[in-house]
């Protein structure tokens, strides 16, 4: 049996197993089918919109069929990108050669896309979230719910904030998060993978069939090729999803220097420890087991450090000596390497809180990216990592201290 056949057989077995054992996949109906909209149309935004639109089309008892996707309007050979998507049913710039469902409608008008939505899925580079949310204030249903697929933090005078919390604060709607070992091209090609959705049921929950809950979110995102686990640890998966991009830059540096797999593994080991420490230090409500049990944790870290935009950018930085910003422009076709922004935000917060010495890898990535510290200094910058402090952090959690 070929490897592809074995993988397909494994996926079928897992799908059948979930049908038998997962109560969240039981039949769910809504009093009024939910309208779903997606904000963002990059490769990951378009991929998630594809997943969602496939499910809304198959489940009329739960969702309205049409899914609107907000597209930042740009011209492709003189034709608006939204028009191309709606005519060819492909996002020729950010997700070429992938057919999109005909019930997925591209819309360059942000308010028209979101004003009637019951579920809003945010999937844009996180540095643009503020201006997008500002436009949406007072223009959406007050009863809407949201899921953020963004990776990063909002850093301000009051400290570091989860992007899902930022959406809730600014729009007054409950917002969860989606994160996992999900390279967009592989999901778009329907290669089997898994992800984690985290959502906290709000105090104003209206009841089964009247509001969004874990079962509804499972039905919205789960596909035979895209397995979903729904939990309530929004903080945990958000932290892991943001910080893995910083670790991936470190892996890209050592890859570009030609140091091999051993060096990349060392970066990932140190990085995982710092991710857990960051969560316990600044978001004590996060759960340690999320980092090693969920796709959004160590699985996503491994995948991101094996490929993806952040590794590509950092590798090219090491090979050419160019800045991250320049490499991003050169090779990413208008997309972003989120680690470049996140490492700066994390540095700003750690510096203001006096904790830079507690996170030597995060600080090293920042210093290399923005302060011209030679990449060859990376091993010496992280070799004094206090492993005992990370171990104590995990141990104290397990003991309930």
Swiss-Prot record:
<dbReference type="GO" id="GO:0051287">
    <property type="term" value="F:NAD binding"/>
</dbReference>
<dbReference type="GO" id="GO:0005975">
    <property type="term" value="P:carbohydrate metabolic process"/>
</dbReference>
<feature type="binding site">
    <location>
        <position position="128"/>
    </location>
    <ligand>
        <name>NAD(+)</name>
    </ligand>
</feature>
<dbReference type="GO" id="GO:0046168">
    <property type="term" value="P:glycerol-3-phosphate catabolic process"/>
</dbReference>
<dbReference type="GO" id="GO:0141152">
    <property type="term" value="F:glycerol-3-phosphate dehydrogenase (NAD+) activity"/>
</dbReference>
<dbReference type="InterPro" id="IPR011128">
    <property type="entry name" value="G3P_DH_NAD-dep_N"/>
</dbReference>
<feature type="binding site">
    <location>
        <position position="309"/>
    </location>
    <ligand>
        <name>NAD(+)</name>
    </ligand>
</feature>
<keyword id="KW-0560">Oxidoreductase</keyword>
<feature type="binding site">
    <location>
        <begin position="40"/>
        <end position="45"/>
    </location>
    <ligand>
        <name>NAD(+)</name>
    </ligand>
</feature>
<feature type="binding site">
    <location>
        <position position="184"/>
    </location>
    <ligand>
        <name>NAD(+)</name>
    </ligand>
</feature>
<dbReference type="InterPro" id="IPR006168">
    <property type="entry name" value="G3P_DH_NAD-dep"/>
</dbReference>
<dbReference type="Pfam" id="PF01210">
    <property type="entry name" value="NAD_Gly3P_dh_N"/>
</dbReference>
<feature type="binding site">
    <location>
        <position position="338"/>
    </location>
    <ligand>
        <name>NAD(+)</name>
    </ligand>
</feature>
<dbReference type="InterPro" id="IPR013328">
    <property type="entry name" value="6PGD_dom2"/>
</dbReference>
<dbReference type="InterPro" id="IPR017751">
    <property type="entry name" value="G3P_DH_NAD-dep_euk"/>
</dbReference>
<feature type="binding site">
    <location>
        <position position="151"/>
    </location>
    <ligand>
        <name>NAD(+)</name>
    </ligand>
</feature>
<feature type="binding site">
    <location>
        <begin position="309"/>
        <end position="310"/>
    </location>
    <ligand>
        <name>substrate</name>
    </ligand>
</feature>
<dbReference type="InterPro" id="IPR036291">
    <property type="entry name" value="NAD(P)-bd_dom_sf"/>
</dbReference>
<keyword id="KW-0963">Cytoplasm</keyword>
<dbReference type="Pfam" id="PF07479">
    <property type="entry name" value="NAD_Gly3P_dh_C"/>
</dbReference>
<feature type="binding site">
    <location>
        <position position="151"/>
    </location>
    <ligand>
        <name>substrate</name>
    </ligand>
</feature>
<protein>
    <recommendedName>
        <fullName>Glycerol-3-phosphate dehydrogenase [NAD(+)] 1</fullName>
        <ecNumber>1.1.1.8</ecNumber>
    </recommendedName>
</protein>
<dbReference type="InterPro" id="IPR008927">
    <property type="entry name" value="6-PGluconate_DH-like_C_sf"/>
</dbReference>
<keyword id="KW-0520">NAD</keyword>
<dbReference type="GO" id="GO:0042803">
    <property type="term" value="F:protein homodimerization activity"/>
</dbReference>
<dbReference type="GO" id="GO:0005634">
    <property type="term" value="C:nucleus"/>
</dbReference>
<feature type="active site" description="Proton acceptor">
    <location>
        <position position="244"/>
    </location>
</feature>
<dbReference type="GO" id="GO:0005829">
    <property type="term" value="C:cytosol"/>
</dbReference>
<comment type="similarity">
    <text>Belongs to the NAD-dependent glycerol-3-phosphate dehydrogenase family.</text>
</comment>
<dbReference type="InterPro" id="IPR006109">
    <property type="entry name" value="G3P_DH_NAD-dep_C"/>
</dbReference>
């Amino acid at each position: 049996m070929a490897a592809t056949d074995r993988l397909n057989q494994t996926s079928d077995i897992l799908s059948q197993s979930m049908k038998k054992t997962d109560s969240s996949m039981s039949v769910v109906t809504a009093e009024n089918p939910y309208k779903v909209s997606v904000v963002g149309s990059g490769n990951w935004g378009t991929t998630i919109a594809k997943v969602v639109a496939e499910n809304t089309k198959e489940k009329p008892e739960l969702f309205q069929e049409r899914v609107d996707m907000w597209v930042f309007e740009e011209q492709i050979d003189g034709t608006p990108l939204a028009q191309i998507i709606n005519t060819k049913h492909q996002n020729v710039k950010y997700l070429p050669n992938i057919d999109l469902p005909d019930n997925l409608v591209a819309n360059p008008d942000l308010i028209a896309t979101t004003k009637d939505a019951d579920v809003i899925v945010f999937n844009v580079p996180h540095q643009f979230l503020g201006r997008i949310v500002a436009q949406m204030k007072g223009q959406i249903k007050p009863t809407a719910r949201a899921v953020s697929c963004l990776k990063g933090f909002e850093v301000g005078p009051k400290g570091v904030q989860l992007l899902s919390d930022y959406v809730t604060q600014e729009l007054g709607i409950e917002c969860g998060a989606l994160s996992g070992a999900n390279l967009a091209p592989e999901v778009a090609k329907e290669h089997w993978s898994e992800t984690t959705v985290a959502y906290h049921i709000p105090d104003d929950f209206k009841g089964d069939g009247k509001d969004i809950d874990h079962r509804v979110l499972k039905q919205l995102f789960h596909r035979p090729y895209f397995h979903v686990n729904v939990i309530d640890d929004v903080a945990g998966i958000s932290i892991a999803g943001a910080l893995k991009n910083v670790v991936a830059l470190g892996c890209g540096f050592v890859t570009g220097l030609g140091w091999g797999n051993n060096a990349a593994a060392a970066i990932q080991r140190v990085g995982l420890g710092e991710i857990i420490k960051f969560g316990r230090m600044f978001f004590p409500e996060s759960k340690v087991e999320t980092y090693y049990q969920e796709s959004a944790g160590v699985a996503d870290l491994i995948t991101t450090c094996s490929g993806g935009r952040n590794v590509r950018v950092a590798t090219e930085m090491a090979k050419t000596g160019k800045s991250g910003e320049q490499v991003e422009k050169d090779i990413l076709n208008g997309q972003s390497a989120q680690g470049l922004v996140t490492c700066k935000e994390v540095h700003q917060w750690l510096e203001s809180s006096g904790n830079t010495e507690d996170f030597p890898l995060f600080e090293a990535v920042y210093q290399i990216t923005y302060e011209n510290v030679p990449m060859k200094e990376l091993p010496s910058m992280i070799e004094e990592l206090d492993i005992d402090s990370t171990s104590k952090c995990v141990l104290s959690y397990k003991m309930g201290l």
